[in-house]
UniProtKB/Swiss-Prot annotation:
The modification Phosphoserine is found at S18. One of its GO terms (molecular function) is ribosome binding. Component of SEC61 channel-forming translocon complex that mediates transport of signal peptide-containing precursor polypeptides across the endoplasmic reticulum (ER). Forms a ribosome receptor and a gated pore in the ER membrane, both functions required for cotranslational translocation of nascent polypeptides. It is a single-pass membrane protein. It comes from the Eukaryota. The gene is SEC61G. InterPro entries: Prot_translocase_SecE_dom_sf, Translocase_Sec61-g, Translocase_SecE/Sec61-g. Residues 62-68 are extracellular. This is Protein transport protein Sec61 subunit gamma. GO terms for biological process: post-translational protein targeting to membrane, translocation; protein targeting to ER. Residues 1-32 are cytoplasmic. The SEC61 channel-forming translocon complex consists of channel-forming core components SEC61A1, SEC61B and SEC61G and different auxiliary components such as SEC62 and SEC63. The SEC61 channel associates with the multi-pass translocon (MPT) complex. (Microbial infection) May interact with Zika virus strain Mr-766 non-structural protein 4A/NS4A. May interact with Zika virus French Polynesia 10087PF/2013 non-structural protein 4A/NS4A.
Amino acid sequence: MDQVMQFVEPSRQFVKDSIRLVKRCTKPDRKEFQKIAMATAIGFAIMGFIGFFVKLIHIPINNIIVGG
C-alpha cells in the first residue's frame, strides 16, 4: 500500500497545483491583448525583412560563385 501511495501522491499534488494555477490565471484585457498582438506583428515583420534582405544579398553572391 505504501508503494501505491508513493506513486499516487505526486500525481495528486500535481493535479492540486494545476488547479490552483488555472484558478489564478486571468484572460488579458483588450489593451493587453492589442499590445501583445502588435509586438508579435512587429516581430514577424522584422523577421520577414531580415529574411528578404539576406536572400536579396545572397542571390547575386551565389550567381558570382556559381558563374551562372
